[in-house]
């Protein structure tokens, strides 16, 4: 993954990365990775890389099973609302 932006989390050794996926030779797509360190401090190869286009379906499936905590839902709604306002304004 060609990382273009990194977001820290509250968990030590865990960051969220956004960038161009390994499978996109043209660099026109985006993916997200939940990157975790391994025991030695290096990159855990089990850290999943997911196409941005898959996130909506994943979140809808998990939300449909009531598996997301209320506080996480609220934070997502705030972030998604802000994104929608930015997109509608442009």
Where are these regions (language model features)?
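Negatively charged, low-complexity tracts enriched in Asp/Glu with abundant Ser/Thr
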Residues: 1-13
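Generic cytosolic/nucleocytoplasmic N-terminal low-complexity/intrinsically disordered segments
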Residues: 1-4, 28, 43, 86
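Extended hydrophobic/Leu-rich segments
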Residues: 5-7, 18, 32, 73-80, ...
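A short, structured beta-strand/loop element
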Residues: 14-49
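Mixed-charge, Lys/Arg-enriched low-complexity segments
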Residues: 38-90
């Amino acid at each position: 993954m060609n990382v273009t932006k990194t977001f820290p989390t509250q968990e030590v050794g865990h960051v969220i990365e956004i960038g161009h996926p390994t499978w996109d030779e043209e660099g026109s797509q985006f993916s997200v990775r939940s990157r975790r360190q391994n025991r030695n401090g290096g990159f855990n190869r089990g850290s999943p890389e997911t196409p941005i286009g898959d996130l909506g379906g994943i979140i809808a499936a998990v939300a449909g099973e009531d598996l997301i905590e209320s506080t996480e839902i609220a934070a997502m709604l705030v972030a998604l609302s802000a994104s929608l306002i930015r997109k509608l304004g442009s």
